[in-house]
Amino acid sequence: MALVDKHKVKRQRLDRICEGIRPQIMNGPLHPRPLVALLDGRDCTVEMPILKDLATVAFCDAQSTQEIHEKVLNEAVGAMMYHTITLTREDLEKFKALRVIVRIGSGYDNVDIKAAGELGIAVCNIPSAAVEETADSTICHILNLYRRNTWLYQALREGTRVQSVEQIREVASGAARIRGETLGLIGFGRTGQAVAVRAKAFGFSVLFYDPYLQDGTERSLGVQRVYTLQDLLYQSDCVSLHCNLNEHNHHLINDFTIKQMRQGAFLVNAARGGLVDEKALAQALKEGRIRGAALDVHESEPFSFAQGPLKDAPNLICTPHTAWYSEQASLEMREAAATEIRRAITGRIPESLRNCVNKEFFVTTAPWSVIDQQAIHPELNGATYRYPPGIVGVAPGGLPAAMEGIIPGGIPVTHNLPTVAHPSQAPSPNQPTKHGDNREHPNEQ
């Protein structure tokens, strides 16, 4: 009898010790599964396979924080976003647990990075995103301006008869030879350099202005560097913008700088809409000071010809912020963004992040291990959080089968994939994982 009592005492002590405590794993941090949200999209089929073993993934399909479900605002510790939603300080303050934001793309002007840093939120981007696509699209715009293919197509669609030499001269008026022309690039990062390589093949003389770039790059690419914006504008037959938008270069192209450009120069912008004062550009196009312009980005997006200062501007080509897009680029960007979120979860913020853009403003917050244990939602992977609750948005024709989840009072979204077994422990920063090993891209360096 005494022996039985002794065993009971031992079991009681063991139960008290283990109650509510996960067993320690020596090779990594101990923390619950965090909630990660894709803010302005509804397809997270690429992100889920990378994150599902250590995080709950939801998508919001929102265009503003007013459309984001309060569960995401209260519990999401990671967020991924495109360029179609803007996060100001006021918006960022609505997130109660947010630690990291990854912009799926290179630009981050739609996030107040200073406010984010002061709130302890790291902001990352994908600087290698869609470099080739953006460079190719830029060259297409430049060639279009010089060879006027868009206007020739429009003339034929409108029934213009083009048979005699005189008719050809009339309809193709303004077409120009490229060889020997000078292309000026404002900003000479990854995309600017890719444009320079392509432009040289067409016979352009290339020069650039970039006050942040170290000397020597121009020698390796066989281009010329100028050290003032005025010099670039004065010497260029075509000016193309390839810089980020910030408080220092808003409306970089304005009435004053346009007057410094060569008479009849071309302007191309596939960077950020806020770099160009569209009112000044429209006036310059009407007066002929600028011969033609091609814009992929605009001050107000989504862009419409029906409104705004450009609606009556001549010799203008506009595309809807699509210079970056290809299926391959989109896939690589999304994989890289999810991998950056994975680094944040398994490592330290901001030290473990590869592309943190607001370290100078960053304020350290509590470690991941103190996240509320109630914020564990393994059954909600791929759920839709959208205000008002209960509404699930599905694209026409449906999405690839990768969504599952429950919305309180709403419509369940399911798929026929096997249930994912979620491990209780995330790997340490130094422990290799199949996602970290297989999904790194050399061009992220």
From Swiss-Prot:
Active site: R272, E301, H321 (proton donor)
InterPro entries in UniProt: CtBP, CTBP_dehydrogenase, D-isomer_2_OHA_DH_cat_dom, D-isomer_DH_CS, D-isomer_DH_NAD-bd, NAD(P)-bd_dom_sf
Asymmetric dimethylarginine PTM sites in chain numbering: R22
Molecular function as annotated in GO: DNA-binding transcription factor binding; NAD binding; oxidoreductase activity, acting on the CH-OH group of donors, NAD or NADP as acceptor; transcription coactivator activity; transcription coregulator binding; transcription corepressor activity
Annotated positions of the Phosphoserine modification: S428
Oxidoreductase among keywords: yes
Protein purpose: Corepressor targeting diverse transcription regulators. Functions in brown adipose tissue (BAT) differentiation. Isoform 2 probably acts as a scaffold for specialized synapses.
Name of the featured protein: C-terminal-binding protein 2
